[in-house]
């Protein structure tokens, strides 16, 4: 089977979630089966393995609906895309598309960094289910990253095609000495559904803990969060390398998130892989990902988050959570996910 993997959503500077998913799967899949990568920018190769590649047009260009005409030149049997928007008109190959989450149907605010016209289209697209159905039913099969999202796809009848769960995994973070510190770590965006406000309020109830916010944050959002709970000890990293992120996690009391919705939850796996406990909102996908390793709190219960963090002051509880975390994280590997994906791609 001649496989082509759409790598055009890989970033040129540093990974985001979909970029990391693509690179992780491609690297592991190449260990199992020959493949060719589709790229749209040579700079993407910085974050991809050294494999055969073919350059085509950008996935955000006006010609995307017709990109299959370029892909046909490779004479592939199957093409896998880590998104659901890959153009398919005129294709002469099997196509597998991916849905990562359905967050924006329930939380309609688009990413703030999109241009205004794209934001308008984003809102319009997520006002109804039928555009998603049209996209997915063009494929021969659909992939998603969690059982929770697969269930939602079924609930809303988003496709007539078979749906396969190919989970995310976490790239190994740099290991090193871990000196225990009263430090809470949040890795994620500051979009409203992420509910960072609840973490800030919880931090105000934990005066002996710092809350480290690792991601880039707009100046206005930083000021708003600081004013929300002036007594909270907030540390804004405004972006962090893998090394800085790992250093923050090692020895931290917990990774925390009060998100109301996710497709998976990669930061949970990253933290658990280092033996760092996770204190997270009680939503189905976090129960799926962390299982018995997690501590779960109502997303609006700041006092509940504070109590769950204080429970980790008990050395025995902290040790048990750390051991359970490492064991749970070990179940998520790119090798396992690639094997699942390869089975799908070679049996269409």
Residue positions per predicted region:
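Carbohydrate transferase catalytic cores enriched for Leloir-type hexosyltransferases
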Residues: 1-348
């Amino acid at each position: 089977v001649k496989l082509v993997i759409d790598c055009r959503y890989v970033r040129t500077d540093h990974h985001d979630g979909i970029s990391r998913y693509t690179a992780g799967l491609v690297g592991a899949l190449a260990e199992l089966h020959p493949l060719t990568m589709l790229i749209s920018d040579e700079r993407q190769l910085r974050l991809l393995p050294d494999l055969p590649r073919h350059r085509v047009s950008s996935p955000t260009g006006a010609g995307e609906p017709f990109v299959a005409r370029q892909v046909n030149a490779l004479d592939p049997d199957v093409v896998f895309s880590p998104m659901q928007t890959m153009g398919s008109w005129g294709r002469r190959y099997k196509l597998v598309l991916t849905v990562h989450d359905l967050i924006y149907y329930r939380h309609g605010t688009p990413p703030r960094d999109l241009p205004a016209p794209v934001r308008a289209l984003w809102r319009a697209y997520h006002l109804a289910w039928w555009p998603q159905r049209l996209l997915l039913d063009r494929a021969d099969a659909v992939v998603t990253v969690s059982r929770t999202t697969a269930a939602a796809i079924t609930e809303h009848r988003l496709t007539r095609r078979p749906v396969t769960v190919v989970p995310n995994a976490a790239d190994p973070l740099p290991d090193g000495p871990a000196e225990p510190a009263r430090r809470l770590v949040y890795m994620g965006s500051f979009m409203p559904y992420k509910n960072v406000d609840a973490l800030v309020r919880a931090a105000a109830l934990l005066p002996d803990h710092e809350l480290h916010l690792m991601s880039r944050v707009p100046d206005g959002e930083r000021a708003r969060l600081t004013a929300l709970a002036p007594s909270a000890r907030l540390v804004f990293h405004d972006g962090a390398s893998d090394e800085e992120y790992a250093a923050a996690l090692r020895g931290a009391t917990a990774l925390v998130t009060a998100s109301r919705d996710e497709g998976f939850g990669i930061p949970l796996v990253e933290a658990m892989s280092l033996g760092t406990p996770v204190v997270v909102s009680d939503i189905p996908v976090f129960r799926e990902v962390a299982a018995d390793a997690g501590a779960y709190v109502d997303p609006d219960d700041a006092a509940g988050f504070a109590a769950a963090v204080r429970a980790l002051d008990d050395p025995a509880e902290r040790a048990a959570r750390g051991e359970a975390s490492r064991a749970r994280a070990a179940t998520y590997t790119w090798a396992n996910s690639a094997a699942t994906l390869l089975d799908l791609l070679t049996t269409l």
